[in-house]
Curated annotation (Swiss-Prot):
Matching Gene3D superfamilies: 3.30.465.10, UDP-N-acetylenolpyruvoylglucosamine reductase, C-terminal domain (3.90.78.10), Uridine Diphospho-n-acetylenolpyruvylglucosamine Reductase, domain 2 (3.30.43.10)
Alphabetic keyword roster: Cell cycle, Cell division, Cell shape, Cell wall biogenesis/degradation, Cytoplasm, FAD, Flavoprotein, NADP, Oxidoreductase, Peptidoglycan synthesis
One of the Pfam families matching this protein, by short name: FAD_binding_4
Protein name: UDP-N-acetylenolpyruvoylglucosamine reductase
GO cellular component terms given for this protein: cytosol
Length: 349
């Protein structure tokens, strides 16, 4: 009697081009690539002699990575799909999505099914599985606000583990998976808790201005109104990666203490800032970069976008080294002029 097919078996793609798998469009290559469509494939990796001893990189939408060289290992393309309501109670829906689901499509799906909450995070590039790694955020909302739990596979052992918010240790564009857990886990599913009592988050002036331009008051705004406003803002400010390669916001907004902020404001009274609950102050990195004269400037084939100084772009043929050189030049100028350190959001490999 024939053996049933092994659903965990990997089909390896040798010398695989990665330009289509990173939103910068950088033409790196991987020694091997493999498309992962189910958690069992991640769980079986450590038993596969072809890849068990190779460096491994889990890649979703490729919107948070800069390849500075070819990857001499196996790139695991996370394509695990699925969306479902796993349970609900009187207060909330608990919605699970596969790690390979497109983030924006998932947000749109929750709204279409009457489960709002994530609309401020619309149009952020990448996958559901990448969202907790970065604790993605925009327009006054971080993903952690609606996070319930996730399931991840430890690549070295194939062990499946559940992480709650405490174990994920979320920070500003940060989590356990960017620190101690970096490179160790593949996120296969994420569950979100979406409250049935919806409260709009309209603290950002860009959002209220866009609503006002549409004739919508904050009091009358629906979840769909907020979603549409955020999509319109992002499309106006950020270039389409399919047209102009980029990774969205390249730098984190730096957070400094009150004393450093007072000194900075004495030199630059119009500095754009956002007070934080702990007494620290978040600065607008785009404003700092613009003040240093970088908006629209280029180094080789890498450039600063002419409408959004926080976005670095590939004008065509840029290498990862070009992007990194531009980023370092910007960091040096901001440090020299303002005494502030800018930290890159994407992972540079």
């Amino acid at each position: 009697m024939p053996m049933p097919p092994d659903d965990s078996a990997l089909s390896l793609l040798p010398d695989h081009p990665l330009a289509a798998h990173n939103t910068f469009g950088i033409a790196a290559r991987a020694r091997f690539a493999a498309r992962i469509t189910q958690a069992a494939q991640f769980e079986a990796l450590h038993r596969d002699p072809r890849v068990a001893n190779l460096p491994q990189l889990v890649l979703g939408g490729g919107s948070n990575i800069v390849f500075t060289r070819d990857f001499d290992g196996v790139v695991l393309l996370d394509e695990i799909a699925g969306r479902r309501v796993v349970r609900e109670d009187d207060d909330a829906w608990y919605v699970e999505a596969g790690g390979g689901e497109n983030w924006h499509a998932f947000v749109a799906w929750t709204l279409e099914h009457g489960m709002p909450g994530l609309e401020n995070l619309a149009l952020i590039p990448g996958t559901v599985g990448a969202a907790p790694i970065q604790n993605i955020g925009a327009y006054g909302l971080e993903m952690k606000a609606y996070f319930d739990s996730l399931v991840a596979v430890e690549l070295a052992t194939g062990r499946r583990e559940r992480f709650d918010a405490a174990r994920c240790a979320f920070g500003y564009r940060d989590s356990f998976f960017k620190r101690e857990g970096r490179g160790r886990f593949a996120i296969v599913a994420v569950t979100f808790r979406l409250p049935k009592q919806w409260t709009p988050r309209l603290g950002y002036a860009d959002v209220t201005r866009e609503l006002d331009a549409r004739g919508i008051t904050p009091e009358a705004a629906t979840p769909r109104d907020v979603f549409d406003a955020v999509v319109a803002i992002r499309r106006a400010k950020l270039p389409d990666p399919l047209v102009l390669g980029n990774a969205g916001s390249f730098f984190k907004n730096p957070v400094i203490d009150a004393a450093q902020f007072d000194a900075l404001r004495a030199r630059a009274p119009d500095v754009v800032s956002y007070p934080q609950p702990d007494g620290q102050v978040k600065l607008a990195a785009g404003w700092l970069i613009d003040r240093c004269g970088w908006k629209g400037r280029a180094l080789g084939a890498a450039a600063v976008h002419d409408r959004q100084a926080l976005v670095l772009v590939n004008r065509g043929g840029a290498t990862g080294a070009d992007v990194l050189a531009l980023a370092r030049a910007i960091q040096a100028d901001v440090r020299a002029q303002f005494g502030v350190e800018l930290e890159a959001e994407p992972v540079c490999l």
